[in-house]
Regions:
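Short, well-ordered coil loops that connect the C-terminus of an alpha-helix to the N-terminus
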Residues: 39, 86-87, 131
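Amphipathic, interaction-prone secondary-structure segments
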Residues: 59-105
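Short coil/turn segments at secondary-structure boundaries
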Residues: 44-47, 93, 132
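Short runs of predominantly hydrophobic/aromatic residues within well-ordered alpha helices
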Residues: 45-48, 68-77, 110, 114
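A recognition module on extended beta-rich or small alphabeta surfaces enriched in W/G with H and D/E
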Residues: 101-148
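N-terminal low-complexity, intrinsically disordered segments
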Residues: 2-66
Length: 148
C-alpha cells in the first residue's frame, strides 16, 4: 500500500470536441422538452429549475438513459452558472478521470453536475431540482472558503 497522496486536480478550459458533445446533449434535451411541453424552452437560467423538475416528474427518462440524464445535468449546470456568481464550466483531470465540471472561482471546489442527477436516478432516489440547486448555492456560500 502506498502512502502517496492522489494527484491534485488540474483545471482547463473544456476542449472544443467536448463542448460540441455537451451542445448536442443540450439540443437533444431541448427537443425532448419541446415535444413533451409545447412552448417550453430551456433558457440556461434559474427559470429552468421548474422545467427540469417537470422532466423529472414526467418519468419520461429511464434511470439507465445516461445521455439524457447527463443532458439534464448540463441544463442544471447552465442554470447554476447564471445563479451563482463565480461558477464556470471547466474540464477537470484528477484521480477519477477527465470530466466537465462546475468550478467555483479559482478554488478546488467543483461540482460533478453531469452525473449528479444520473446517480440519483440510478439509485431510485427522489430528485428535487430546486432543493438541489438551493443546497448547492448554500454550500458554496458557506463552505467555499474551505477550498483552496
Amino acid at each position: 500500500m502506498s502512502d502517496s497522496q492522489p494527484a491534485a486536480a488540474t483545471f482547463e478550459p473544456i476542449p472544443t470536441d467536448l463542448l460540441a458533445q455537451m451542445h448536442g446533449l443540450r439540443a437533444a434535451l431541448g427537443e425532448l422538452i419541446a415535444s413533451l411541453f409545447p412552448g417550453a424552452v430551456l433558457t440556461g437560467t434559474g427559470a429552468d429549475f421548474p422545467l427540469l423538475q417537470q422532466m423529472v416528474d414526467s418519468q419520461t427518462l429511464a434511470a439507465t438513459d445516461e445521455p439524457a440524464w447527463e443532458a439534464m445535468g448540463i441544463a442544471l449546470g447552465d442554470a447554476l452558472v447564471t445563479e451563482v456568481p463565480g461558477l464556470a464550466w471547466v474540464q477537470v483531470s484528477d484521480e477519477f478521470g477527465v470530466d466537465p465540471v462546475l468550478r467555483y472561482r479559482q478554488t478546488s471546489l467543483q461540482i460533478g453536475v453531469l452525473t449528479l442527477l444520473l446517480k440519483r436516478a440510478e439509485q431510485g432516489e427522489e430528485i428535487d431540482i430546486q432543493h438541489i440547486a438551493n443546497w448547492l448555492q448554500k454550500f458554496i456560500e458557506t463552505k467555499a472558503d474551505e477550498y483552496q
